[in-house]
Amino acid sequence: MEMASAFTLNVRLDNIAIITIDVPDEKMNTLKAEFASQVRAIIKQLRENKELRGVVFISAKPDNFIAGADINMIGNCKTAQEAEALARQGQQLMAEIHALPIPVIAAIHGACLGGGLELALACHGRVCTDDPKTVLGLPEVQLGLLPGSGGTQRLPRLIGVSTALEMILTGKQLRAKQALKLGLVDDVVPHSILLEAAVELAKKDRPSSRPLPVRERILAGPLGRALLFKMVGKKTEHKTQGNYPATERILEVVETGLAQGTSSGYDAEARAFGELAMTPQSQALRSIFFASTDVKKDPGSDAPPAPLNSVGILGGGLMGAGIAYVTACKAGLPVRIKDINPQGINHALKYSWDQLEGKVRRRHLKASERDKQLALISGTTDYRGFAHRDLIIEAVFENLELKQQMVAEVEQNCAAHTIFASNTSSLPIGDIAAHAARPEQVIGLHFFSPVEKMPLVEIIPHAGTSAQTIATTVKLAKKQGKTPIVVRDKAGFYVNRILAPYINEAIRMLTEGERVEHIDAALVKFGFPVGPIQLLDEVGIDTGTKIIPVLEAAYGERFSAPANVVSSILNDDRKGRKNGRGFYLYGQKGRKSKKQVDPAIYPLIGAQGQGRLSAPQVAERCVMLMLNEAVRCVDEQVIRSVRDGDIGAVFGIGFPPFLGGPFRYIDSLGAGEVVAIMQRLATQYGSRFTPCERLVEMGARGESFWKTTATDLQ
């Protein structure tokens, strides 16, 4: 049976050809290799019809133009040559579209990303809708790749090299008005008239490219270009620490095209695409993409979720305020905040106002839309307005008796079906539910700070939590724009449990004489966004270390912090950034204030600050403990799969994405090699480095956690 075409051609009475993009049985349009023959057949018809005045590409999907190329195509390539051939095929197809003798216009609504934007760039003009769903970008770098169908060559010539480099190197997505301002699109119109606006543009002569700004014209010249690439290269190297080869190749390919012409540029682009597709970094980043997509489809349990019409929040502090914001502004649900102090409510409301007002100032949101979203948030000092809330999120202090009291109050003041979700980071959910009348409706919902930025949430059912409660909580997390993983109700859950030994080891190295900045720089070089000491300062030393005694009580002395160090720091009123002094000293509030290591920290903890370890040795000690604990979490079924473990570490604590997560990283090293490293460290530094039984067994058998493909587990 012949496959239904993703591209269909209709010619209007006014001799404008409409090519409709609609990949059968898929929510999103993605480009696949087999579509090339369909497009070529249409191009042949267009060339044969001498009456045609113009062509319009438009999507039949409600919220996307083309979301990119199908990433599975890259995974199917076994060699760099195969991936290079894939890129050349894409380049050739785009060249054939561009070579049509009549105006070709892309009518864009929704996501126009990757190969989708490359197709739009091959057209002679572009019109997009003013809808918030409309975004344009080249995100290939986030998969360890570069645009392979001409994007590195066409974009700099259209909008200027410095602007194009920013887009390609970061994967930054532009909204409609930004795209218009930069000259990426020719017009922005309401969705209702998108097709007609594109048709009118197609009836005119080919749109002439607008002159580039003076700055971009200077940077396109030999001297300006040399200066630009030197500056951008330095900045990129500092940001990536040399861990992402795609950024270096992007700079090389764009510069080749500008210096030697498009023919050389296309050749360099295809070659680089093929080579990058085979790098371990790209394979790891693609595995994270597939795993996160998979997690987002996971309902959490087999039971159907209950309806979610409104949410309540207990506590208007920083976490409560952030949760209220994502519930109202991302999930679109009415949310009511209860705080015993009216100031807490005001703080929470102001938090959402500040977030939304920032979007209005950046022209990402209309003022009317801001007001509409703010209207979803209300506050109270008692339980008025809570009677029919479907789910209550508790975000009060980490105190077991207080949280148990909250459960009792919710059961007394809310409906029989109301779910109680605790945002605890350390207390067992089973203990919180111990005196509940409806324990099956009590669950953990652990957000990470800052709530609006951190993508992960841990969902923690206790032994008595119902399947429907799990499914409903997962459903809410997804509506809030989060990536949820379901974890077992054991001390520290997953993320904090693997993070604690990593931070403990950093503190231990401080006491041995390593300097704060050396430890942090070593882990940033390894690939973490910030070092462990800075992370502790950012989270708050008091908050971040509160879980250590809980973990030590549950799992023994491998979780013990160096004696008296934490208490010495806290007794000196050092809480980190929030009170201006921790391991670092912070200037006055404001973006320009720089932190610096406080030299007084060394005598305070009885250290000299004259270490002897190299950066790789520092990173090895911290990371190996994290890997060992992650394997224990699989063994104890704290996480349901290594997929969840990799996603939890990357999205929850910034484990280097280019390594694919703890389990991908163990596989890349080999379990046997990890065991050997840990045994060496155990001999040098003590029994906390003893590899767990599961790792030793896997090393002996030569086993791995993942199969060779990006999506399958062993």
UniProtKB/Swiss-Prot annotation:
Q: Where in the cell is it found?
A: Cytoplasm
Disulfide linkage = none
Catalyzed chemical reaction(s): a (3S)-3-hydroxyacyl-CoA = a (2E)-enoyl-CoA + H2O; a 4-saturated-(3S)-3-hydroxyacyl-CoA = a (3E)-enoyl-CoA + H2O; a (3S)-3-hydroxyacyl-CoA + NAD(+) = a 3-oxoacyl-CoA + NADH + H(+); (3S)-3-hydroxybutanoyl-CoA = (3R)-3-hydroxybutanoyl-CoA
Cellular component terms, GO, for this chain's entry?
A: cytoplasm
State any single GO MF term.
3-hydroxybutyryl-CoA epimerase activity
Where is it mainly found?
cytoplasm
Keyword Lipid metabolism in the entry? The reply is yes
Ranges for the region named 3-hydroxyacyl-CoA dehydrogenase are: 306-714
Site annotation (Important for catalytic activity) points to: E118, E140
- PROSITE patterns cross-referenced by the UniProt entry: 3HCDH
A Pfam family (short name) is 3HCDH
GO terms of biological process kind: fatty acid beta-oxidation
What superkingdom does the record give? Bacteria
Q: In which pathway does it act?
A: Lipid metabolism; fatty acid beta-oxidation
Q: Which EC number applies?
A: 4.2.1.17, 5.1.2.3, 1.1.1.35
Per the record, which residues fall in region Enoyl-CoA hydratase?
1-190
Q: CDD domains, alphabetically?
A: crotonase-like
InterPro entries per record: 3-OHacyl-CoA_DH_CS, 3-OHacyl-CoA_DH_NAD-bd, 3HC_DH_C, 6-PGluconate_DH-like_C_sf, ClpP/crotonase-like_dom_sf, Enoyl-CoA_hydra/iso, FA_oxidation_alpha_subunit, FadJ
Q: Which UniProt keywords apply?
A: Cytoplasm, Fatty acid metabolism, Isomerase, Lipid degradation, Lipid metabolism, Lyase, Multifunctional enzyme, NAD, Oxidoreductase
Q: Which family does it belong to?
A: In the N-terminal section; belongs to the enoyl-CoA hydratase/isomerase family.
Annotated function = Catalyzes the formation of a hydroxyacyl-CoA by addition of water on enoyl-CoA. Also exhibits 3-hydroxyacyl-CoA epimerase and 3-hydroxyacyl-CoA dehydrogenase activities.
> What interactions and quaternary structure are annotated?
Heterotetramer of two alpha chains (FadJ) and two beta chains (FadI).
Q: Which HAMAP family match?
A: FadJ
Q: What is this protein called?
A: Fatty acid oxidation complex subunit alpha
Organism encoding this protein = Escherichia coli O9:H4 (strain HS)
Lineage from the top down? Bacteria, Pseudomonadati, Pseudomonadota, Gammaproteobacteria, Enterobacterales
> By which gene is this protein encoded?
fadJ
